A protein has these predicted regions:
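Short beta-strand segments
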Residues: 22, 59-60, 88-91, 153-156, ...
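Ligand-binding beta-strand-loop-alpha-helix segment within the catalytic cores
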Residues: 11-86, 203, 208-220
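ATP/nucleoside-binding phosphotransfer catalytic cores, i.e., glycine-rich phosphate-binding loops
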Residues: 143, 149-225
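A glycine-rich beta-strand to alpha-helix segment
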Residues: 77-102, 220-225
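A glycine- and small-aliphatic-rich helix-loop capping segment at beta-alpha/alpha-beta transitions
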Residues: 2-13, 37-39, 43, 102-112, ...
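A short secondary-structure junction signal
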Residues: 69, 98-103, 108-110, 163-167, ...
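Short glycine-rich anion-binding loops that position phosphate/pyrophosphate groups of nucleotides
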Residues: 26, 93-96, 102, 158-159, ...
Length: 225
């Protein structure tokens, strides 16, 4: 997000015609809380660029609202906007994308998910000791993510290496939700060396990437953004 802000400040990138749909949001937490994803997006991106905040959406379900109806409403909002052009993802140490934890249906849509203990432990560093940490979240489903025209997943650090290996080279499995990206025809996986350390065919992936760029340049399909 810092790089996007810099490009905007340099007048090389505008968000004036952008609609944003966040992957997920905690339940039971105020959107103005420092731990909410709404606040995170405001502080790290939205407050610093020319995006219309009326066109920034997060999946929410407040007390008294019907979770199924809220999930369907979010899905409909995405469809009405013309779908998602670029889905930006991270990956959890257990292979989750969004808050689609292991055993999530590969056909899932936006809904409430209970967070695993591993996810709670990994995210506990973001909460103060006496601060409420939600155990539930509203998240886009795996099928929702796969509907995007392009997917960019970024991972850094050795603690993500096992999940990255399972995602890229393991079987398609609900136990590693990120493995569903094997089905996407326009998925880009961006890794540092630590996150890629358990991949057995790193040299091949590097060679194939370079060859792909070369071929696309020859056919005039390559764009350096």
């Amino acid at each position: 997000y810092k790089q996007l802000v810099v490009k905007h400040q340099q007048n090389t990138l505008s968000f004036d015609n952008t609609t944003s749909f966040n992957l997920d949001e905690y339940l039971g937490i105020d959107e103005n809380s420092s731990q909410s994803y709404r606040q995170f997006m405001n502080e790290n991106l939205f407050d610093h660029v020319d995006i219309n905040k009326n066109k920034t959406f997060l999946p929410t379900c407040n007390q008294g609202e019907n979770p199924r109806e809220q999930g369907l409403a979010y899905e409909n909002s995405i469809k009405e906007a013309g779908g998602i052009d670029l889905q930006i993802l991270g990956i959890g140490a257990n292979g989750h994308i969004g808050f689609n934890e292991p055993t999530s249906s590969l056909a899932s849509r936006t809904r409430i998910k209970t967070l695993t203990q591993q996810t709670l432990d990994d995210n506990s560093r973001l909460f103060k000791e006496d601060e409420f940490q939600p155990t539930l979240a509203m998240t886009m489903g795996i099928a929702t993510i796969l509907d995007a025209r392009y997917v960019l997943l970024m991972a850094t650090g050795e603690n993500k290496a096992k999940a990255v290996k399972d995602m890229v080279a393991g079987p398609l499995s609900a136990m590693c939700p990120a493995s569903s990206l094997q089905l996407h025809e326009n998925a880009i996986i961006l890794l540092d060396k630590a996150a890629a350390s358990e991949l057995e065919d790193q040299d091949y992936y590097t060679w194939a990437h370079d060859q792909n760029i070369k071929i696309n340049k020859e056919f005039g399909l390559y764009h350096n953004y």
